[in-house]
Amino acid sequence: MSAAFAGPFIERNIHKASLIACLCFTAGMAGTGLCIRYSTMLGTGLTTARIFLFYGCIMGIGLGIGYLTPVKTLMLWFKDNPGLGTGISIMGFGLAKAIASPVMNTLQGRIGLANMFFVLTGVYFLMMMLGHFLLKKPEGWVEPQVKNTVNRLKLFRNKTYAGIWLMFYINITCGLALISYEKPILQLAGFGMAAISVVQSLTAASNALGRIGFSTFSDHLKDRNSVYKTIFLLCIGTAAAAFAVSAVSKGILAVVFILLLVVNAGYGGGFSTLPALLSSRFGMKNISSIHGVALSAWAFAGLSGNQLTALILRMTGSYENVIIVLAGLYLIAFLIAQFVVGTEEQELCVPSGAASAE
């Protein structure tokens, strides 16, 4: 949620934002390590509360600000291909998981959980500070002199913006509903542990490639919303096919594998294409603010995605029912993309003087 509120600050000073992102992220990580190290002394309740503070709040603030900071800058550097720019930025966010997860597992096994956090604090601090010093806008770029403001609540009165937020929310909810249960789905389908590790590496790669692939593809389309329609149709088709043949319960490995690849690619592509789609509808003015508010859908989807799967499994005990529900949600998202999201550029920002006069 920090991304939803930090947008105006990032617009004003991108360098200060990147520094705060670095300090909050690494301070939260170091604090988490300390909580784990002294958990016996602190007690379970106090340790849990402090981990929530450091890992959930402080580190989360750094994560949200750090996610937004490079997006507009890269869109300015790639002004003729903004989808490629956002794809590079957001692919880095997704690819980091594929790289960091095995490193974290190795460190935890060799030096323990608390020391893992301390080592990663140093590594991330160096990398994020390097990014902070290298970050700059293109030579000759001048921000517009007229300051604009965005009323976060009024954003959702705009049909196009509300439609974009909702279809993004559905895409992330569906993605998390499947991705968070990837391992048990693969186990039930009959994959061995070695094969599961390989498949999860490939789905992570599909997620990363979807981020740069779909957003770059949007640069070559008349309407960037067509990317979302493509994602939803692909997910509907593969989910319907997997349901029709009972791929999970009958162990049809190829169909399960393709379904996970497609959903992961669409999940990643939904993230990376979002800022380019928003800029095509509402311009570059305050894009960090507008994009940040749209990312609140990610926060809500994080609460609903895996819970949706858990609810369906508790009620029916079948992954096939999960898959067909997701196909229905993807269909709703496609209809929103087709009939609710407008095609024309609109004005969401108003001059600050006008805003204060209200």
Residues of each region from the PLM?
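C-terminal transmembrane helical hairpin of 12-TM major facilitator-type secondary transporters
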Residues: 204, 222-277
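Intracellular juxtamembrane helix-capping segments at the cytosolic ends
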Residues: 65-78, 85-86, 269-282
